[in-house]
Amino acid sequence: MTAEQLLLIAREFCAQHKTTVTNFGALVAAASVSSARIDGIPVHANRQQAAHAMQQILVAYPALNKHNRAFAALSARVFMETESRLSLR
């Protein structure tokens, strides 16, 4: 997931939950961890681990001024659904 994609999710979440993004760096970190590679080798063994890592980052480094656990869970779910659909192609 790109930082831009995660920002789109955040904007929609914020509109529905009357909250705001306060830490754009946290969004970038969470997006980066979802597709992290070292020497071209994925850091995570599978997309479930990548989604969990992204969720952990968003909880540890809150991106919003409130409802961060709910946002982290939603982001991980969207990541899993998106990755699942892409793997079907």
Residue ranges: model-predicted function:
Residues 1-89:
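FIC/Doc superfamily catalytic core
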